[in-house]
């Protein structure tokens, strides 16, 4: 998996944690190099285990994947996630895609200098459909070299379901106080397991064995949480 820009040979452990009591609801061990295909399956499993129809999924940028986010939204979940940084062709951040405004009524983009980019073709990549927009005013623009290196002028791609991502972005911005709690909820458990419990690497091999080993450790974590919330006598009464 990816680790600080390099690739490490290791397993990738996913976890879903409830925000109220910080119990681990579900875990999954994968050998994927990143988290981008894990958002929906983890959120779906957690929702089913909690037997709830309402679920707010708070995830870090590593999980940002348009298809995964849309699956969550289609299932009635609320998703709070920061946008991943786009691969922009220009180093000048004043002309990154995020600085361009989309007008849904006219189906055009407006660039930071007020020029318009009109739709000119449909395209697809990795099974995802996009619309492409191009500016016809680049030739005489004094900011051209800061905006694009293409001889034909600046272009922008828009995914067919990008409006879903726009809505998720607005939802995340409006609930930034909730999003900020993510580290305390999820990162806390990994810090506890690694530092307090001293569990920093797996002893088993093969993914099914590692998954069982991780599950055992997280059961111990959940039990530790229980003991911090209830006395031994209270637990005995609850489970008797």
Explain the meaning of each model-derived region:
Residues 1-240:
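Anion-binding and metal-coordination hotspots
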